[in-house]
Amino acid sequence: MTLRFPDLNGWLAWQETLNPKAIDLGLERVRRVWGRMGPAQLPFPVITVAGTNGKGSCVAMFEAIYRAAGYRTACYTSPHLLRYTERIRCDGEEVGEQALCEAFERVDRARGHGPEQVLLTFFEFGTLAALDLFLRWSPDVAILEVGLGGRLDAVNLIDPDVALITTIGRDHMAWLGEDLDAIALEKAGVMRPGRTAVIGSRVPPPALRARAVEIGAEVAQLGLEFDVHRVPDGWHWQAGGSAPLAMPSPALRGPFQLDNAAAVLMAVSVLAPRLPVSVNAMRQGLHRAHLAGRFQVFPGAPTLILDVAHNGQAAQALAETLRAFPCPGRRHAVLGVLRDKAVGEILEPLLPLFSTWDLGQSDDARALPVADLHAAVMAAIGAGVDPACVRAHASIAAALAAARARAGVGDCVVVFGSFTTVEVALRASADGTGVTP
């Protein structure tokens, strides 16, 4: 096969210039191209995961559980941290660059020629390539993570057998709406009539369940159709009138991960007639699931913690997890955010937890200028603070180095605010893996 570009970097750089709009929500373009590439529906079970926070964690748990049960998995997630190939995985392994380039070529040819050629966005190109690869891999189950919203996201091209919607918060409001009900309706777009929609929130916006009932979807909501019960050595999962199942604490750290795990187990149980999973495989999967950048801990002096929290809801979850994490010394924040984020909502739950703030600006064109971030942090902290406690740096790498330099042996350095911020710290780590003790 002759390729437009011989390497992955060439393909990705070109895709970023293909459509003048970085985000152009809608399904018409991907439907036209996919109609020339593959069947309307994939010939294996599909789980679609939507929501504001927790999507990646849920995908990681699905993957680990189904692999523990002996099934072949295919996963599509976004964004990536270190390598684009992280987005597309088969049986836990990243797609090879050559195979991905060939998939890109097939997508490119299916776009057509001349004035009728379809101008795909960067995300749409990757989504179609992932679906093309999944057809060739023929896994037992595919897990798809929505990129933005749900209703008009390219992933919604495929009808899921089960839709899981995690928590819903205020993020991407320029595209999804200003209030939670409006955002919920966009997420609800991944639901399908006659199929199960798992809602992984105890108190979702009312519009979410109402929409499920309106279209005739089967609803399973945390706290109603299924629930979790904490016990001293773990937790119990229970659906309907069934007997409670004892489960270990998820390997992914944070009190909210129990809700994510419960929602995942509910979806697994819905698909059990087609994909039976033993209780032991569920336990193994929850114990093995790992995801970079989600309260990822690098022990040392000081301890380094990486978390991609980038909105108010995720910042609140990070604050709760930090309070439960042993840190005998002081906490030092390394922060960089994107321009479209509500900085005040990110700062509010975290301000009381940190002694110092080192601020930086990533190379991402969407990054908030560090001078603006510094002003926001100073305003949030208020008068009387020692200016030396809040310092602005030219880069995330410089901010991280400064925080590490002033941290003591028992201290914790916490890097958060965006995927690109965490990427810098992850590249600077010893082996890029981290552990969660």
Where are these regions (language model features)?
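Nucleotide phosphate-binding/pyrophosphate-handling subdomain across enzymes
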Residues: 45, 141-146, 153-164, 168-170, ...
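ATP-dependent carboxylate-amine ligase catalytic core
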Residues: 7, 21-23, 27, 31-35, ...
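Active-site-proximal loop/hinge segments that shape catalytic or ion-binding/gating pockets
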Residues: 418
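Beta-strand->loop->alpha-helix junctions that form or flank phosphate-binding loops
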Residues: 76, 198-201, 213-230, 251-254, ...
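C-terminal helical cap/extension that packs against the catalytic core
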Residues: 198, 202-220, 231-234, 303-306, ...
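Short Gly/Thr/Asp-enriched flexible loops that form oxyanion-binding sites at enzyme active sites
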Residues: 62, 151-161, 426-429
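Acidic, Mg2+-coordinating active-site environments of NTP-dependent enzymes
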Residues: 114, 118, 140-145, 160-248, ...
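N-terminal leader/targeting and accessory segments in enzymes
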Residues: 1-53, 57-72, 81-83, 196-198, ...
